[in-house]
Amino acid sequence: MNIRQQLVQLLNLAMVLSTAFMFWKGLGLVTNSNSPIVVVLSGSMEPAFQRGDILFLWNRDKYVDIGDVVVYEVKGKPIPIVHRVLREHKVTNKDRKVRQLLLTKGDNNPTDDLSLYAHKSNYLDRDEDVLGTVKAYLPKVGYVTILITENKYAKLGLLGLMALSTLLTRE
Amino acid sequence: MSGITKPVNLYSVAELRNATDDALPLALSKLGYEQSFSLIDTKLAIGYVATILAGSLYYLEKKYNNDFSNLTYYYSMVALVVGYFALNGLLWLHGKYREKDIKYVGINKNNQKKISIEARVENNTTPIYKVTVIENNRLLGKQDIPFTGIFDEDGFIHIDQLVEIFTRLLQEKEK
């Protein structure tokens, strides 16, 4: 085997990984969301969404509506949360910029999300905290990623399989 | 030099084709040709530049914590994503219109003439190697080579037979 053939094989592997990554980033740019696809990790939105559902987000609407299901991330807590918008306020700043402030709640939770928000904050900021509104979903498919993130052997096994298959096939 | 020392599975057309593709440089070097790598090098260069773009975006994502409100990050992301897919498009065009089925490009050491060899198989159930030889953009000859003619029963390729076939193919034009 010569060096160019090996470089081609390595390139094929690199292309598989980089194309997946760049599609993800491209989708992020189109939807204007830095995490355009998320997997539901908790049961707090049952029966609307179950653990393992995949959600597709869209973040180009200027304001979100009451009743929309949004995904938000609280500063300092790296896990995105999927909950429904319960109330909203539009506040005009001194620089005449309108901010939309939100209160959210999980359909399956007994109380609203005040206790989940950042320290001393009693609202979410539409522009700063919300990753996007849920526009579509695929039920259960995301369970694979839950398995991978919560079980390190599943993760290693899958990575190994992917690497092997791209290195061994030459079609 | 895989495919020459290693037997292939005679029931797999893909393996037969790969082994024959791999044997072309050796066969043609025996006929006085020196292989030219410009096509594959172009492909490698475009591909690896694209990969570097993706890699640097990965680095930026970590550096800026994937914060879309940071405009430096946002616009470099736009540039890198657009650049990446442009290069991929280029790679696709290169494969479709320049590389096509070309498996070997070589230059004759004596008369400096450049030949390209296109080779393909019709499908995965027809064990016939369809070869087209082009010399300086002029069609030199076509031949369908059944794999039974160049592989023996044990799955070893016979370079001499391949050399013989190409000697005939390359001589035809000189008449």
Curated annotation (Swiss-Prot), chain A:
<dbReference type="InterPro" id="IPR019533">
    <property type="entry name" value="Peptidase_S26"/>
</dbReference>
<feature type="active site" description="Charge relay system">
    <location>
        <position position="83"/>
    </location>
</feature>
<keyword id="KW-0378">Hydrolase</keyword>
<comment type="similarity">
    <text>Belongs to the peptidase S26B family.</text>
</comment>
<keyword id="KW-0472">Membrane</keyword>
<comment type="function">
    <text>Catalytic component of the signal peptidase complex (SPC) which catalyzes the cleavage of N-terminal signal sequences from nascent proteins as they are translocated into the lumen of the endoplasmic reticulum. Specifically cleaves N-terminal signal peptides that contain a hydrophobic alpha-helix (h-region) shorter than 18-20 amino acids.</text>
</comment>
<protein>
    <recommendedName>
        <fullName>Signal peptidase complex catalytic subunit SEC11</fullName>
        <ecNumber>3.4.21.89</ecNumber>
    </recommendedName>
</protein>
<keyword id="KW-0645">Protease</keyword>
<dbReference type="InterPro" id="IPR019758">
    <property type="entry name" value="Pept_S26A_signal_pept_1_CS"/>
</dbReference>
<keyword id="KW-0256">Endoplasmic reticulum</keyword>
<dbReference type="GO" id="GO:0006465">
    <property type="term" value="P:signal peptide processing"/>
</dbReference>
<feature type="topological domain" description="Lumenal">
    <location>
        <begin position="25"/>
        <end position="171"/>
    </location>
</feature>
<feature type="active site" description="Charge relay system">
    <location>
        <position position="113"/>
    </location>
</feature>
<dbReference type="GO" id="GO:0005787">
    <property type="term" value="C:signal peptidase complex"/>
</dbReference>
<feature type="region of interest" description="C-terminal short (CTS) helix">
    <location>
        <begin position="157"/>
        <end position="168"/>
    </location>
</feature>
<keyword id="KW-0735">Signal-anchor</keyword>
<keyword id="KW-1133">Transmembrane helix</keyword>
<dbReference type="GO" id="GO:0004252">
    <property type="term" value="F:serine-type endopeptidase activity"/>
</dbReference>
<feature type="topological domain" description="Cytoplasmic">
    <location>
        <begin position="1"/>
        <end position="6"/>
    </location>
</feature>
<keyword id="KW-0812">Transmembrane</keyword>
<feature type="active site" description="Charge relay system">
    <location>
        <position position="44"/>
    </location>
</feature>
<comment type="subunit">
    <text>Component of the signal peptidase complex (SPC) composed of a catalytic subunit SEC11 and three accessory subunits SPC1, SPC2 and SPC3. The complex induces a local thinning of the ER membrane which is used to measure the length of the signal peptide (SP) h-region of protein substrates. This ensures the selectivity of the complex towards h-regions shorter than 18-20 amino acids. SPC associates with the translocon complex.</text>
</comment>
<feature type="transmembrane region" description="Helical; Signal-anchor for type II membrane protein">
    <location>
        <begin position="7"/>
        <end position="24"/>
    </location>
</feature>
<dbReference type="InterPro" id="IPR036286">
    <property type="entry name" value="LexA/Signal_pep-like_sf"/>
</dbReference>
<dbReference type="InterPro" id="IPR019756">
    <property type="entry name" value="Pept_S26A_signal_pept_1_Ser-AS"/>
</dbReference>
<dbReference type="InterPro" id="IPR001733">
    <property type="entry name" value="Peptidase_S26B"/>
</dbReference>
